[in-house]
Structure formats: C-alpha cells, structure tokens
Amino acid sequence: MVTCSMRCTEEHLLGAPAAFSSGKRKRDSGYSPGDATPGDRGEGGPDWPSAGIKKRVKYSRHRKQRLELRSCDSGVADLYETPSPSPVAPTPTNEPYDSPCTSMPDRLGLQSFSDYGHDCYLFNKSLEDKFLTVNCLKNQPQIKAESRCKLISWLIPVHKHLKLGFESLCLTVNILDRFLACTPVASDCFQLVGVTSLLIACKQVESRPPRVKQLLALCCDAFSREQLCNLECIILLKLCFRIGAPTINFFLQHFSLLRVTSVESPDTELIEATKSMTVARGIAELSLADYAFNAYSPSLVAACCLELADRMLCLRNPIGVRVSGYHQSLIKECVGKIDLLVSLNQDSLHRLLPSQFSVKSIKADN
C-alpha cells in the first residue's frame, strides 16, 4: 500500500539525480565492470573526445492547444477549450422538444421492438413496485403537495429549455420522490434538490447532460457548486445508486408501438400512433406535477394517458387500456382523475403540446 510518506520519499529521491550515477545504477542491476563501455570508464575512443560523450540538447516542447484541467460535472470532461457560440440567434422552430416523429416511423426500430419489446416490457414491469413511492411527503414537515407541484411545474419548462427528453423529466420526478420518501428536506433547499435530481437523471439518460453552472444560473445563483455536488452524493447514497427506474415514457412508447401491427404497417398507423403519444406525453406531464397520481404505477398512468389522448383525437383505432393488464375498476378510477385534471388545465395542456396541435384539433371535453 502506497502511503503519503512513501510518496514523499520517492519524490525526494527523484528530485536528487546527482546522488545516482550511471555506473551505480548498472551495478545495482547486476552490471559487471567488464561490461562497461569506454564512455562509462572515461576512456576516449577514436571518435570520442576525452571529456566523454556530449549529452543531447533537450528543447522545450510546445503544445498546439492548451489543455485546461478542470473538474467534470457532466460525466465527460471537456479537456479542450470549446469554440465560442455563434452570435447569431437560432431561428425558433415549432417542432416539439422531444418529437416522437423521428422514432415511431423508423422501420428498424419497429423490427427491434418486435424482437425484444415484450421482454423489455416484462423486465420494466417487474421493477415498478421496487421504484414506486407512495405518500413520499408523509415524513416531510416543511414540504407539502403544493410545494412539490410548484417545483415540478418549474422543472417542466426548465427541461424543455435545456432541450432534454421526456425520459429525463420522468426519471427526475422519480428520483425526487424517492429521496423525499427517505430524507427530510428543508423548504429553503427544495429547489436545489430538484435541479440535483435533474442532473442525476440527465447523467443517466442524456448523451450531453447540462453543466452545473447552467443549472445554478437557472436558480439565480442561489446555491453554490459545492452545495449541488455534495447533495448529489447524498442523493446517490440514499438511493443506493439505484437510478434506472421504469418511467411513464417507456410505457408510453411501448403501448404506442403495440398499436403498429407490423413492420410493413401503413404510414397512417404510424402517424396516428405518433399523434396519440405526443398528446399523451403532454397529459403525463400534467400528472407528474399532481401529487394525487403519485400512488399509481407508471404503466397504469401511461395506459390511461393514451386512452384519454385517443378520445381527444377521435382516433379510429384506439389503443385501449386493456393492454395494461390492470383491473377495470382501477383503470376507471385513474382515467377519471386524469380526465378531471385535463379539464381543469386545458390552457396548460395546450402550452405543453407542439404548435401543430391546435385547440380545434383536440376535443378536450370528453
């Protein structure tokens, strides 16, 4: 075992090159005097000066690009200086932040789903109860359901501003609720718990997670970098590093792909599945902020959101909640709560949906 004292001794020895000669190093390694070269014995040869061999001159090395040593906060360290962004403002687009249009019509993805989709579904279905948090605010003296609703309602536009996927948002809420279920949190640092949960979820899901300074700037620099990093370690320890939880987003994708009959399905089926899943994601975002849906499993919420989305879009072939495998009474209860939630938050729902989903194209009154 290398200790600090041993390292100091090695540095001291390496810093004194005069104490070791080339001859001594050779003798220590089994070198015999008969194997010495004329240069080692100080004897001049026909081509060697009597003073010995001249040492080769060493020139200082210059790097083409300066390396910057800094701590990594997003999983991958940025060793080089990144180029400055273009001063031209990006052109705003009306595309959804996490559009399923790029994944649903993918024929290769449909083939992979037909091969492994059922096994993945069974695996995530078996993990639901282990990651489900019921009454996570039971032991929170300072955090109420209203505070949780405000925080998640703030995290929804934050994750859209950072162009993160819906999977990151679902995983963030799961990490947040599981941490609240086991650790009391003060109200003045509740926002820090939210952005730290978002950072952990992004490191698990996203290929380019946001940087710590970005998240701190969104909090108006109310917290320090050390506070966020320390809280990140605390959350990971409290959750025993069990981060990969089944989310609503996974079951939304699974049930939507079940709507597609085969790889050779017509484009109309793919378009309907895409529209339904997009509207269901907006409904699911509303349910994430509502504490009443904390007791329902992600697969049940996903199936009920798709059921309501099919009604709102008046699709010819609704997916139905029968694919979820739950009892009819439980499905009816969950669908009724989601229907009431949508009717009370119609304006918020239309703001969450892409611009192509106009108010007239969606029948919100069911």
Curated annotation (Swiss-Prot):
One of its GO terms (biological process) is cell division. Keywords: Cell cycle, Cell division, Cilium biogenesis/degradation, Cyclin, Cytoplasm. Its main location: cytoplasm. The keyword Cytoplasm applies. It is found in: Cytoplasm. GO terms for molecular function: cyclin-dependent protein serine/threonine kinase regulator activity. It holds the Pfam family Cyclin_N. One of its GO terms (cellular component) is cytoplasm. Specifically required for generation of multiciliated cells, possibly by promoting a cell cycle state compatible with centriole amplification and maturation. Acts downstream of mcidas to promote mother centriole amplification and maturation in preparation for apical docking. This is Cyclin-O protein A. It comes from Xenopus laevis (African clawed frog). The lineage of its organism: Eukaryota, Metazoa, Chordata, Craniata, Vertebrata. The gene is ccno-a.
